[in-house]
Amino acid sequence: MNALTQTWVSVGSIEDIPRRGSRCVGYGEMTIAIFRTIDDRVFALEDKCPHKNGPLSQGIVHDGCVTCPLHSWVISLETGAAQGADEGETRAFPIRLDDDQIMLGLG
């Protein structure tokens, strides 16, 4: 789906998410984790590590990545791809800020 036909949904304020933290939203059967970095960048990933489906929302946010709490896989917040020697990826979603409102791209 391209940006012109993308459906944007407000999922709350950036102030609802602590720096280096996350919040989850439901989308059908899927849970999407919304992450906020220390420098207020916001990212969205399916809340499922590509290794053993661990809850990424419960991981540690650092350096543009999140570390899965189950087996310490490091996942890029931008792409959803595993870093280092690990292979696999989780779905990443487009996200933007409109003032302080987090807009999640679905489609």
Regions found by a protein language model. Name each.
Residues 63-69, 82-91:
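Short cysteine/histidine-rich metal-coordination sites, predominantly Zn2+-binding motifs
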Residues 49, 68-71:
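Short cysteine clusters
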Residues 1-63, 89-107:
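N-terminal pre-ligand scaffold of iron-sulfur
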Residues 55-62, 73-84:
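Iron-sulfur (Fe-S) cluster-binding segments and ferredoxin-like electron-carrier domains
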